[in-house]
Amino acid sequence: MEKIAAVIVTYNRLALLKECLQAVQEQSKKVCSIVVINNASTDGTTEFLETIDDTRLVVKTFETNRGGAAGFSEGISIATRQGADAVWIMDDDTIPQSDTLIKLVDTMDNHQDAGFVCSKVVWTDGSVHMMNIPGYVSHDELCADLYAIRSASFVSLLVPCKIVREVGLPYKEFFIWVDDAEYTSRIFKAGYKGYLNNNSVVLHKTGANYGAGIKVATPDSAWKFYYYMRNSMFASRGERPWIVWFFRHLNHLRLDIRRTKNMPVEVRGAFKKNLWRGFVDGLTFRPTVDYVSDEES
């Protein structure tokens, strides 16, 4: 697998984007292109990207913030149309080591059944990042530091473009959250294998090592839980009989609302409102898969 395109989605995190880009440019396995989707940043990102002297850089700037999901969908589409063999997907706060990519590529090349391969994601203290623990098929090693997985995050994920063309793009309508889990699960359900290479390591440079659950939610993140509930409901649709699916998510809603009791009174209502809205909209939310069109510009 020779031609690897890096796909980076960014929004108002210029300092982290600079670190991410430098780390991508310094890979021992050189990428053929670096596709940056700028989600209408207002912190100088647009101006900074205009100063970069690298012919591999491809920048698409949205006029409005369309969310990470639309950014990844657009970036993967651009890289695939430009003839890459695979896309290496990451957020702007992902800092790869110099050999991160080559180790992903080696795993992909040695496993013809691979639909995606992800890196081990750590926080600044070297501990495993709670936000990016993949969905394991088994916790048993297949071989040294290689594990079978069924889902992974968009924090250092390698996907062959032939599979992108087959299964389509991530749902841009998700806006944020669950887009990566749904997409990798879709590839897995199409009959391909997923792998975690623990020797391929990236730093996820968040402010703290936290997961995505409501137990660790910050007061200003209430709006995100609308997308969490709605997208989670869609992603699991069809896995069980409708009535089981309905009551399963109704129970999740009940438990999450109960967990808001530990939150400050002034933000509790916002969390409840967004969870309820997400649940109601999740009953009818039905986005359709977009496929790569080579006629697009």
List where the protein language model places each region.
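Glycine-rich, basic loop-to-helix element that forms the pyrophosphate-binding segment
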Residues: 62-82
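Non-catalytic, C-terminal membrane-associated alpha-helical segments of glycosyltransferases
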Residues: 114, 241-297
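A short, conserved alpha-helix in the catalytic core of glycosyltransferases
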Residues: 163-168, 173-206
